[in-house]
Amino acid sequence: MESVALSRIGLAGLAVMGQNLALNIADKGFPISVYNRTTSKVDETLDRASNEGKLPVAGQYSPRDFVLSIQRPRSVIILVKAGAPVDQTISALSEYMEPGDCIIDGGNEWYQNTERRIVEAEKKGLLYLGMGVSGGEEGARNGPSLMPGGSFTAYNNVKDILEKVAAQVEDGPCVTYIGEGGSGNFVKMVHNGIEYGDMQLISEAYDVLKNVGGLSNDELAEIFTEWNRGELESFLVEITSDIFRVKDDYGDGELVDKILDKTGMKGTGKWTVQQAAELSVAAPTIAASLDCRYLSGLKDERENAAKVLEEAGLKEDIGSASRGVDKKRLIDDVRQALYASKICSYAQGMNLLRAKSLEKGWDLNLGEMARIWKGGCIIRAVFLDRIKKAYQRNPNLASLVVDPDFAKEMVQRQAAWRRVVGLAISAGISTPGMCASLAYFDTYRRARLPANLVQAQRDLFGAHTYERTDRPGAYHTEWTKLARKSQ
């Protein structure tokens, strides 16, 4: 009889994400125990559970009572701040857990921390999952994208719960077993890196349309609404159209124009760029988006630079660049440039996942990654279905850029893409994401690059040797001596 009263699963960490995920689980018919070190959050969650449909949520006020209220083998989700708080929570809960029980960390954790915790958990006979959760507060409550990696046994213990709780799309729930070790956290990290790129590219489209095209916020709202009905249909494009419509409560006009132009960040974009560098994977669009966040933080320096350079004679070119612009054509060009740039950004993210999968032996299914990102998550977009199909057609696809369907689209959008970047440059408007994407495309598609000169330079000053195009082997040349002889 005792087991009847036990919860199916537990969740510790009741900030908004934790509360919403717990209520989502309960809403799907799974009795859940909840715990938070600050006990007022437990009461808050219980109040919400009552108000949102008398959901089966049991509040617990100590680690011991919490753990013992869950049926064996116990599965406990932790949603606390990454780093030391996770270790502290694990320590408090594992004291009362038994071999075969499972801990699931749902935070944005560095993947190597997850791999360390897997080893530590195994010593106690515990199972461990590092699970990326994307979708923000709304996604956690109504259906997120879930990326669990680690113990396959632990995944199977909660698979039925995760599949009901996750966002649902036409080809299934937005969750799959990612792979061993810290793969779930790594995939979520790359998701966030792609998200950085997406947001940067959208902000550049906005900048060009507003400052070169002279479009109002009302016009921008309509344009993004229209774009969200086509190839650019996505969560980020949808919310952007909403943002342009919100009026300022404290004054005239729209709120977006009153927001300080300094972008915050929590570190996952930086981790993505660092991992790309470690694995020798080119990810210039994601890197450019990170650099832009750093530069946005230099507000005082940027204002001073604008003043100093104006005094030095730099003239504002936006006005001259915008004169005579065909608005209709510009809008369509920007749409095409945004789409082509996005393909490059996603290609970079997917290539990073593949490189890490090869290094770690995770055997990541890139088509499945695209599928579970189709719903619930921040980067959900209609064209993820086409990315899924590209990897289903060819699991060993070197890059999305060379998938036959995407290749045609890139070629079709080239002229518009170049016009937008050229116009922005002539207007003095920075579009680092679009420029990085275009440079990536142009570099990747060239059969021969000027890297031959770089190799010659390296050989001259460092005797690093070089290869030839016409015969095998490594060669070294006494460049300076031969150059002087020929003078």
Swiss-Prot record:
The top EC class, named as a word, is oxidoreductase
Q: Which residues form the signal peptide?
A: none
The EC code for this enzyme is 1.1.1.44
What reaction is this protein's catalytic activity? 6-phospho-D-gluconate + NADP(+) = D-ribulose 5-phosphate + CO2 + NADPH
The keyword Transmembrane is assigned to this record? no
**Tell me, what does this protein do in biology?**
Catalyzes the oxidative decarboxylation of 6-phosphogluconate to ribulose 5-phosphate and CO(2), with concomitant reduction of NADP to NADPH.
Q: What is this protein called?
A: 6-phosphogluconate dehydrogenase, decarboxylating 3, chloroplastic
State the organism of origin.
Arabidopsis thaliana (Mouse-ear cress)
The UniProt gene name for this protein comes to: PGD3
